[in-house]
Amino acid sequence: MLGLDACELGEQLLELLRLALCARVLLADKDGESTPSDEVLDEIVPEYQAPGKKSMLAIWQLDPGDVSLVKYKQALLGPLPPIMDPSLPNVQVTRLTLLTEQAPGPIIMDLTGDLDALKNQVFVLKEGIEYKVKITFKVNKEIVSGLKCLHHTYRRGLRVDKAIFMVGSYGPRAQEYEFVTSVEEAPRGALARGLYVVRSLFTDDDRLNHLSWEWHLHVCQDWKD
């Protein structure tokens, strides 16, 4: 970085700090660590002003002649994803799958088509079984922080359960991501059997509604009921 004046050097250091924060965001959920907010950073670094969010393209185009910085960005962010259709949303949720070895067949919810049609479908779950939820999604353009999936479950008009799955933070890439929850147990007993309405939401730390949909779950005594 020879030849930079003090202001330019300061901008470079701030951008490197920005990249380091991106790394913390991408790895926080794996390590179980929390990511420092801009407010905390302001206290750690006196007179620090948090930079505005930069696009992935802008980050990649920063100092293309600095070999060490280019290598650092490649290790941190991975390859620059191919140019996507600008009409595509940044986050696309494609499927929700219930994983259980006890089911007679796959239980897959396609989220790329007519979401209203899901209201007319009933997904059957045998009482008392153990299962996991797999969420399949894509990130197309920019880093997204704090993805989470919420499920509000209703029976006879009353909310009986609220589940929040912390999915994490991800950068754009051509391949889909998959997130699998920990093991859940379906309710059991005569009082638990019946039809449930589930309202699901896929959102993030910025509270953007990436996808919301409603579906029906029938807890039965047996798969054939």
UniProtKB/Swiss-Prot annotation:
Could you tell me one molecular function GO term of this UniProt entry? Answer: GTPase activator activity
> Single GO cellular component annotation?
plasma membrane
Q: Which UniProt keywords apply?
A: Cytoplasm, GTPase activation
Top-rank taxon: Eukaryota
Query: What Pfam families does the record tag this protein with?
Result: Rho_GDI
Q: Where in the cell is it found?
A: Cytoplasm
Q: In which tissues is it expressed?
A: Detected only in brain, lung, kidney and testis.
Predominant cellular place of this UniProt entry's protein: cytoplasm
Q: Which GO terms describe its biological process?
A: blastocyst hatching; regulation of protein localization; Rho protein signal transduction
Question: What does the sequence similarity comment in the record state about its family?
Answer: Belongs to the Rho GDI family.
State what this protein does.
Inhibits GDP/GTP exchange reaction of RhoB. Interacts specifically with the GDP- and GTP-bound forms of post-translationally processed Rhob and Rhog proteins, both of which show a growth-regulated expression in mammalian cells. Stimulates the release of the GDP-bound but not the GTP-bound RhoB protein. Also inhibits the GDP/GTP exchange of RhoB but shows less ability to inhibit the dissociation of prebound GTP.
User: Can you name this protein?
Assistant: Rho GDP-dissociation inhibitor 3
Q: Which organism is it from?
A: Mus musculus (Mouse)
